[in-house]
Amino acid sequence: MKIQSVAILGAGAVGCYVLWGLADKAAANTLQLGVVAEDSRAERLRQNGCTINGQVYHPQVWTPQQAHGVDLLIVALKYGALPRALDSIRTIVSERTVVMSLMNGVDSEELIAAQVGAAHVLPALIKVASHRTEDGVRFDPETTIGIIYGELTAPFDSDRVQAVRALFADTGIHFRVTEHIREEIWSKFRLNVCNNLPQAILGAGVGCYSDSAHIKAISDGLRRELEAIAAAKGIDLSKAAAASTHGSTVPPTARYSTLQDLDAGRHTEIDMFSGALMRMGRELGIPTPYNEYTYHMIKALEEKNDGLFDYSGKDQEPTWAK
């Protein structure tokens, strides 16, 4: 198997890392590379391209129909966008298409597999400390951990694992193949829950975890709940590589994706983080009080961004805490 065509669904911070890494191959005409988009989003991409680390890239923009039959589909969407994109994914995938989801959380592969079949899905994750600025997406190529992927069961060095390795090997994309991809995905999930969420409530950079015993206590509480659920599901997090217990190197001012979303007035992926853990906790009979509080706090911050608590001009309206 040789990968000669790649479609990226989702041209945000994660999708831009893949686009950046494969752009030289596309420019050399050794790879067909396109971003899947429709309507106004497609028009913006055609007009403005994607600005990555200060450089503007103009990828091909494909409809799902035009992307049908690509060798590799990279799904790099926000969690809330996935349900609306499942029809597009079904359209894109042919008998030969391999699908890699680089989305956060632990269930995007299952949701995609339910639509196209598990045989198409090559489990994967990405660790890239990218962020949006006024001039596009920025990340540090050197400190980025990159893409980790692998088969759930033997043979671990399958044809498609080798094909993806060959695709990434002579690019700037950092990658690693693992025989413990399920544990690696859950290890990243643990990082997201414990490191993304407390700082989002506080509104402070990641330095808060080392500078505040109180924020660390919240992070540790979230971690204990997640690890209890993982253990109940038979997931041995100790099998994840040591490098997977931490994220990419960042300054103490860094703001991870959940806080970036709140800063920008966007809704977050909290349903995929604490929301998923609350659901699994109920199914397994495991209490999740730290995640329940965190879930409702971040939902309330979303409501605040939506203007729900704008009481301008209501000074004379009596009310009380209920």
Residue map of PLM features:
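NAD(P)-dependent Rossmann-like dehydrogenase/reductase catalytic/cofactor-binding core
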Residues: 2, 162, 169, 208, ...
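A structural signal for isolated positions on well-ordered beta-strands in alpha/beta enzyme cores
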Residues: 7, 32-34, 100, 148, ...
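Short, well-ordered alpha-helices that flank and scaffold nucleotide-derived cofactor binding pockets
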Residues: 20-24, 87-91, 114, 275, ...
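Internal alpha-helical scaffold of NAD(P)-dependent oxidoreductase catalytic cores
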Residues: 25, 62, 91-92, 115-120, ...
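Rossmann-like NAD(P)(H) cofactor-binding subdomain of soluble oxidoreductases
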Residues: 53-138
